[in-house]
């Protein structure tokens, strides 16, 4: 399974649409910056058919150290980003591909 990096994404979009990579890089970086800013402010990002990104509060909890299960580990409350895939994405991911 391959990893799609920002560099690969820029290259692919640049080739597909015959746009200079620097222009694509600027747009993608701006898009990522705006998404990050929105999440930091607590906004919910919804992309129809793709999914939803939102900040959730994780409650504090007690965990276990696998090397010494007798000693509890206190995990503090924190904020985290949660991604919920959209219907179309779920359907596409659940459908096996020919290469699988």
Swiss-Prot record:
**Which keywords does the record carry?**
DNA condensation, DNA-binding
InterPro entries, sorted: Hist_DNA-bd, IHF-like_DNA-bd_dom_sf
What GO annotations for molecular function exist for this entry?
A: DNA binding; structural constituent of chromatin
The processes (GO biological process) annotated in the record are:
chromosome condensation
* Any one cellular-component term (Gene Ontology): cytosol
Record Gene3D superfamilies: IHF-like DNA-binding proteins
Q: Does the keyword DNA repair apply?
A: no
Q: One Pfam match, by short name?
A: Bac_DNA_binding
The entry's family comment says: Belongs to the bacterial histone-like protein family.
Q: What does this protein do?
A: Histone-like DNA-binding protein which is capable of wrapping DNA to stabilize it, and thus to prevent its denaturation under extreme environmental conditions.
Know the name of this protein? Answer: Probable DNA-binding protein HU
């Amino acid at each position: 399974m391959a990893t799609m990096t920002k560099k690969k994404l820029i290259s692919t979009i640049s080739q597909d649409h015959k746009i200079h990579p620097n222009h694509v890089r600027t747009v993608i970086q701006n898009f990522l910056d705006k998404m990050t800013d929105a999440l930091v402010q607590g906004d919910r990002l919804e992309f129809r058919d793709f999914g939803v990104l939102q900040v959730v509060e994780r409650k504090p909890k007690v965990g276990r150290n696998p090397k010494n299960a007798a000693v509890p580990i206190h995990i503090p409350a924190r904020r985290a980003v949660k991604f919920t895939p959209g219907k179309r994405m779920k359907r596409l991911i659940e459908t096996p591909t020919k290469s699988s």
